[in-house]
Amino acid sequence: MTNIRKSHPLAKIINESFIDLPAPSNISAWWNFGSLLGVCLILQILTGLFLAMHYTADTMTAFSSVTHICRDVNYGWIIRYMHANGASMFFICLFMHVGRGMYYGSYTFSETWNIGILLLFTVMATAFMGYVLPWGQMSFWGATVITNLLSAIPYIGTNLVEWIWGGFSVDKATLTRFFAFHFILPFIISALAAVHLLFLHETGSNNPSGVVSDSDKIPFHPYYTIKDILGLLLLILTLMLLVLFSPDLLGDPDNYTPANPLNTPPHIKPEWYFLFAYAILRSIPNKLGGVLALILSILILAIIPLLHTSKQRSMMFRPLSQCLFWFLVADLLTLTWIGGQPVEHPFITIGQLASIFYFSILLILMPIFGTIENRLLKW
């Protein structure tokens, strides 16, 4: 008699995805972030659902409802801070996951990679809209500044911005629609994640060496289920340390002041995970140019597979490309720092240089270094 997990239509899908899935025997801890992203998504949906039960999407009561959740709702404070810091953990895992894909050449699975880029954009949109909901000063002004960027689009820009706002400024209509979108998008993300996995399981996972591993596969369970549980425990530990000891570490103090359209904060900035893109946006004096650079800073990931010149897939045995990769990581950290600084000397110059380096590494230096390494190996 066949085991029920191999015959039952639903159990079969789970079995082929998480139990009997053939996985390379040498994938490292860098392959843990996919499952951690799944856990983050589930955590965000659950905590978000409980927050939505008490939140009111109205400009008059939104700020008070968040205060009410923290003060009066049973364990409301922990749900709120798990949701806010859970977003930070989500982005840490996302950046690690994308970085792993770039380092080990996983982008050669083009369908999986492109769905991943779509997922990244969707998660960023969701996080941005979520940041607007508490209706603090930074929520309001962040929404005003970022949505206003669309006015740089020639001819239709102004109409587009007013259409998104639902009026002539960020107001009740904007908050209501942002709440509606923030609620629905995580479910769209879940569907996209399922498609992402579907395409991944068509080809099988990549591995650190970048070599086809069909001759050396092991079952996902118990080897990688146990390994993923270790990653999960470390994720929960980090999240709970943040939530219970310094919940406001990654937030902005300005967001504890209710939104006031008559008073602009001295320095408007988004959450930390958008600062690198914000720094690239600010480094270009022209509005339309800045918006294009902002979009391209993420969209550039889509052309990375086309710029792969090396005859090796992974960077594991390519020391020159490794140096360049870590230089890129340092550059992104510099951009993140600059994004949080005021627009004054010397930060403007540092931001402009870091932005030039960012695009130069990805568009020019990476392909050149790949070719040099081929020549060094006489390929």
From Swiss-Prot:
Query: Per the record, what is one GO cellular component?
Result: mitochondrial inner membrane
The keyword Iron belongs to this UniProt entry's keyword annotation: yes
Spell out the subunit comment.
The cytochrome bc1 complex contains 11 subunits: 3 respiratory subunits (MT-CYB, CYC1 and UQCRFS1), 2 core proteins (UQCRC1 and UQCRC2) and 6 low-molecular weight proteins (UQCRH/QCR6, UQCRB/QCR7, UQCRQ/QCR8, UQCR10/QCR9, UQCR11/QCR10 and a cleavage product of UQCRFS1). This cytochrome bc1 complex then forms a dimer.
The job of this chain, per UniProt, is described as:
Component of the ubiquinol-cytochrome c reductase complex (complex III or cytochrome b-c1 complex) that is part of the mitochondrial respiratory chain. The b-c1 complex mediates electron transfer from ubiquinol to cytochrome c. Contributes to the generation of a proton gradient across the mitochondrial membrane that is then used for ATP synthesis.
Q: What is this protein called?
A: Cytochrome b
Quick one: which residues bind heme b b566? 97, 196
Give the stretches traversing the membrane: 33-53, 77-98, 113-133, 178-198, 226-246, 288-308, 320-340, 347-367
From which organism does this entry originate?
A: Viverra zibetha
Q: What else is known?
A: Heme 1 (or BL or b562) is low-potential and absorbs at about 562 nm, and heme 2 (or BH or b566) is high-potential and absorbs at about 566 nm.
Record InterPro entries: Cyt_b/b6_C (IPR005798), Cyt_b/b6_C_sf (IPR036150), Cyt_b/b6_N (IPR005797), Cytb/b6-like_sf (IPR027387), Cytochrome_b (IPR030689), Cytochrome_b_C_euk/bac (IPR048260), Cytochrome_b_N_euk/bac (IPR048259), Di-haem_cyt_TM (IPR016174)
Q: Locate the coiled-coil region(s) and give their ranges.
A: none
